[in-house]
């Protein structure tokens, strides 16, 4: 069974894995920061919108001030990539936002800075490009969902801004309203650099031990190094090859090595007199041999065994032989025969022979058998206080440390005699030391170090100058005091005049002026013309609470900022490519010439022969239409690696790190802040500095006595190595230089920006500043200059690089195709004809006697009629007919016009000679009352009878039509003849009646008071055409489409036309069917006769006289089909057409007696009910079988009915049209 301790071990690797994932996640973060904007103040005195209207709607007629509520002001912000020519379109690629409603017409929020209501924060997660374009708009909230919000004023700004805690203030002082705002860019926590894309988070754990400096560079904690500061610095001197460490100051040896610094190898075990270069070697010392170096190869030299000046010779390992001098013998010459003869005593020693050899009496300072050993007078050490003893012959010498003196260093030395104190009041000798009494401001043993009195003294970003025993704070503007701790109150002197409120700010004040005053001190009456809001040279007139711009003739708008479109309201004439003529009352000629603006806003047009032109461009622009901004960066005027950004007839250099100036020609003095401590001398480098340290100080800034490396020595993750007299930085990839401060490979090489875009280096990333006409991260998206569509009158817009061209449709001209070309300008019409200009053409209205497209053709002979001369081709109306003169012959349409309507009370003159005004019969009054209505008739004029009979169809030379009218849409006093006269005057009869004689007669219906039966007949019918059918079809079409302006047609509710039945195509069945039908008919007659006889016998007194039948104009009742028009449902212009074929059937009614009142009344009642209750108007064409006619047989009326209910209707052949 596992112990709990054993089970818990997997948690440690898991925690390490999680920590590693967190570290990797932190590395993925590319950039993080935020763009902040704060609204400071708003001044919209009149409460107006950008279009000049009031926020509340109405104005006071007296002073023209807005009288209703103030504006509900809020702001919108759009942040996008840098644009040299700011355009409002396109996405807000860097972000957008808005505030809530924060005030009315005028407000000031400077005293409440930090309020989130007037602040807009746009976070970003990309490398901040430094260059930007900002659009700020003030809006009036409508506070409802119906009316849209309205814009008050807008401002745009393009520039550069680096991340900083400081605010940058911007103002909008033109237009309707003035407002002030401030912006800044700040990096999120742990993000640094100009692009907020340098990530550095302090840590002290397994993955690193470092802090972060103000530039985001990792500064390793003491004892650590490496890009991630996770490599411990070993004990100084530790062999980098054979030693390592996991903790600072440690030195752990590899296997086979030993020593304090792991620089000594371990020899072979048992090696006696040998060394090693690699572990486990035994390299013998001189005169030693053997596998373990334990064999003495120089026994004579090592042991000196031969005595009495005997000569020793090595004969083998550990072997020797002594050659004795005269008087001595023995293996080691130890036996003396005449020992003193050889003078064995050295160093002035005296020899005495003895029985065993000799004996030496040594002189002072020497000892040993032969007086060859110097007596060590330094043993024991006679020197005190750490003095070093040097042995002499019969004596010694003490070398004393500086603090001591005397023969045996027993006396204290006076160090003050050497005057070691530099900036001291006095020097005091101490035992084994001294003490310097330093002057104020100095420290150190010798009082040679100036005390840094500046640490933590100056406030509010003031700079401190260190003095001797003191400091001086150099305060930034707006602060005072010894420590710059006091904000100077600029309002103490009450500088604001005229009741203005003074608001104290840092190094300045602002006067909040009351209404009616302006200026820095509220000393001026508000002059709305200063600064001049009027553009394009317009003159500004100051008013009590507003201003007025008197615009030049070519501009319009509140501020004269919009180019006036003269051709919008006044006809224009194209003179040439540069000039357009327009009517004007300001010139004696009545014509003013204006520019066509073909060269755009940056050029002037010059006309040339042949309709050509050239553009004289303003400075900074070129191209056919002056649409191209000249690249002022060509030739690269920026030096020392600076990046050039092109402007309009100008350029701007963005300098590399370490350089400044208009052309980046000046090296920034990195020594200006005096970074070298303790008297070190600073030498300026490019984007770096070097400190020449003194008095034993070391490091990048002379801050340490122990190491050349400090936390800021190597930049950009470089690793610092202490090399005693100097330091060396090991730079990571992409950086070089003594302190890793120079980028090796620029992210702009090769240039990633397309289409002439400028690449700006931003750390290890880049930003593209695109030329006009291009946009996108790398300037690959062509700006759509055709959006919104600038070409009028169906002109085609051709998009170019920062330009567009309108290709006009035929008949139009001008840069935006707004001008209709006057084709009548060349006077193309002949003989004084009138020319009417049209789009891409013209029309000539010819004078009498001329014809043709240009009236150059002379017409034929004139006509003389009714005593008047009529020119050839002329037309005139003659009652209901139209006449025309055709080469001397008068040709008129042939429509019978009927009796002329007249008014009884007007007396003579209304009727032609021989006719009189006869009152209209009561049954002829269609829309009552018809008081005073009459018709012109003569006693000799007989009524015209048409050739229509009850079995006539409009395929013949006759048509029977029944019109049902909506009398509510008709004027009172209309007679049947009035309606018939309007039908005869329809334009559709003009062309048809020129070839045929047309007769139209009308009778009121006896079955319904809102119906009129119309009979149309024609004479002179030819085989190649049927005018009656054509007229009938045109009338049906006119009613169904509600065509024309006739009030009569508009009042028609239903039309019924009698159709011809289809002929049987099976010819051989005709005789058979005729026989069958004849027999059947006879049977029916017999049956009917029998039934009538029986009925009369049952009811002999039930018969009465029947009402006269409605036979149209011939007293014959037609068999009709329904024509209905759905105008009440679908309107008067268009009517949908539907096919309801096979959905209706005929309901037959058989009548056996012509005089039966019940059946006749029932028939009339059914018609009235049917016509009165059908609200939907339909047009029905029906073809049906016609029963055989008898003199007493009346045609059947048919109702629409579902054909699925009557099987008998399946044999009928019909056609229906619903219009």
UniProtKB/Swiss-Prot annotation:
CDD domains: EGF_CA
Signal peptide: 1-33
Topology with respect to the bilayer: Single-pass type I membrane protein
GO biological process: animal organ morphogenesis; animal organ regeneration; aorta morphogenesis; blood vessel remodeling; camera-type eye development; cardiac neural crest cell development involved in outflow tract morphogenesis; cardiac right ventricle morphogenesis; cardiac septum morphogenesis
Biased composition (Polar residues): 1189-1200
DSL domain sequence ranges: 185-229
Alphabetical list of SUPFAM superfamilies matching this protein: EGF/Laminin (SSF57196), Growth factor receptor domain (SSF57184)
Ranges where the EGF-like domain occurs: 230-263, 264-294, 296-334, 336-372, 374-410, 412-448, 450-485, 487-523, 525-561, 586-627, 629-665, 667-703, 705-741, 744-780, 782-818, 820-856
Tissue: Widely expressed in a variety of tissues.
Residue intervals passing through the bilayer: 1068-1093
Cellular location(s): Membrane; Cell membrane
InterPro entries referenced in this protein's UniProt entry, alphabetically: DSL, EGF-like_Ca-bd_dom, EGF-like_CS, EGF-like_dom, EGF-type_Asp/Asn_hydroxyl_site, EGF_Ca-bd_CS, Growth_fac_rcpt_cys_sf, JAG1_1/2_dom
Entry-linked Pfam families: DSL, EGF, EGF_DL_JAG, EGF_TEN, hEGF, JAG1, MNNL
Disulphide linkage map: 187-196, 200-212, 220-229, 234-245, 238-251, 253-262, 265-276, 271-282, 284-293, 300-312, 306-322, 324-333, 340-351, 345-360, 362-371, 378-389, 383-398, 400-409, 416-427, 421-436, 438-447, 454-464, 458-473, 475-484, 491-502, 496-511, 513-522, 529-540, 534-549, 551-560, 578-605, 599-615, 617-626, 633-644, 638-653, 655-664, 671-682, 676-691, 693-702, 709-720, 714-729, 731-740, 748-759, 753-768, 770-779, 786-797, 791-806, 808-817, 824-835, 829-844, 846-855, 925-936, 948-958
UniProt keyword terms in alphabetical order: Calcium, Cell membrane, Developmental protein, Disulfide bond, EGF-like domain, Glycoprotein, Membrane, Notch signaling pathway, Repeat, Signal, Transmembrane, Transmembrane helix
Side Cytoplasmic, residues: 1094-1219
Region (Disordered): 1182-1219
Intervals, Extracellular compartment: 34-1067
GO molecular function, one term: Notch binding
Cellular-component GO terms for this entry: adherens junction; apical part of cell; apical plasma membrane; membrane; plasma membrane
Matches recorded under PROSITE patterns: ASX_HYDROXYL, DSL, EGF_1, EGF_2, EGF_3, EGF_CA
Function as written in the Swiss-Prot or TrEMBL entry: Ligand for multiple Notch receptors and involved in the mediation of Notch signaling. May be involved in cell-fate decisions during hematopoiesis. Enhances fibroblast growth factor-induced angiogenesis (in vitro). Seems to be involved in early and late stages of mammalian cardiovascular development. Inhibits myoblast differentiation. May regulate fibroblast growth factor-induced angiogenesis.
Subunit structure: Interacts with NOTCH1. Interacts with NOTCH2 and NOTCH3.
Name of protein: Protein jagged-1
Taxonomic lineage: Eukaryota, Metazoa, Chordata, Craniata, Vertebrata
